[in-house]
Amino acid sequence: MILNSSTEDGIKRIQDDCPKAGRHSYIFVMIPTLYSIIFVVGIFGNSLVVIVIYFYMKLKTVASVFLLNLALADICFLLTLPLWAVYTAMEYRWPFGNYLCKIASASVSFNLYASVFLLTCLSIDRYLAIVHPMKSRLRRTMLVAKVTCVIIWLMAGLASLPAVIHRNVFFIENTNITVCAFHYESQNSTLPIGLGLTKNILGFMFPFLIILTSYTLIWKALKKAYEIQKNKPRNDDIFKIIMAIVLFFFFSWVPHQIFTFLDVLIQLGIIHDCKISDIVDTAMPITICIAYFNNCLNPLFYGFLGKKFKKYFLQLLKYIPPKAKSHSTLSTKMSTLSYRPSDNVSSSAKKPVQCFEVE
């Protein structure tokens, strides 16, 4: 818990009740190393995703619009990751000034909300494309997808404003270090619990319920399709993919959300024990690594569910340039079921194996 003290030279001086919380030598080595790995892998992977979707696949489908924006949001976050790596390696000493403190903090918050919102919209799009391919054709347009992405970026920007306003550089007098941190003027302030609940509910619980519902309905539709088409072999890979998507999202974010909530309780003074503060402050950067590393892999994960994406991705790795002209395909080509229970369309020759493709 941090207590307010005084202000000098434009930098607020504060006292830390638990100055040793989270300050371990292995954290100062392990976390910067993990950040560096996430930065290299994330920048490389997401840059390739952007190139493949924009230059090779020509951004023709709704799903590709969401994936492109997901990769761009990840890149924006990854560009600030070296700052956090240096910050942690210097034992939580912030050398970059107040403006970069705000920008880097806002980038972390922005990526959280933008990525979660985009994944939620992608799950809704998959549901509409698979379960209601005909009815949703007029709604699942490129214009709607692009407008949705603009709204998502604006919402993520608004959700990140508290980081811009309340994240600042502080000098901790009893440890003699300058940190980039949230600081609340009063323990009675409702702001920290409001921000914490917003992150828990808007940044995880509500999107997870939508994602879980969407893929559960897809699961049921696929099972019904297989029951009707008993003469066709069942492909359990689709069900494994659905399970992987839901569990991947859940276990990536649950640890971070739990420790975020505990951190709010510490900031409010509800938890006073320095041992608990040490556990939370030690675990927090580890949960960040788990959440954001998985987050940065999402564009590749979702992209590789499509055959065309894999084809173009391998072409790019082999330095094969995109074709100047590309024959367009209908947006509704991706992810239609051979049996369409909601649209009363008879079975076709297509198999439901392609239900998660993004081309």
UniProtKB/Swiss-Prot annotation:
Record: residues binding angiotensin II: 15, 17, 167, 182-184, 199
Modifications made to the protein after synthesis: C-terminal Ser or Thr residues may be phosphorylated.
TM regions (residue ranges): 26-55, 62-89, 99-125, 142-165, 191-216, 240-268, 279-304
CDD domains: 7tmA_AT1R
Transmembrane in keyword set: yes
Spans within the Extracellular topological domain: 1-25, 90-98, 166-190, 269-278
Localization per record: Cell membrane
Name of the protein described by the UniProt record: Type-1 angiotensin II receptor
Source organism: Cavia porcellus (Guinea pig)
UniProt lineage: Eukaryota, Metazoa, Chordata, Craniata, Vertebrata
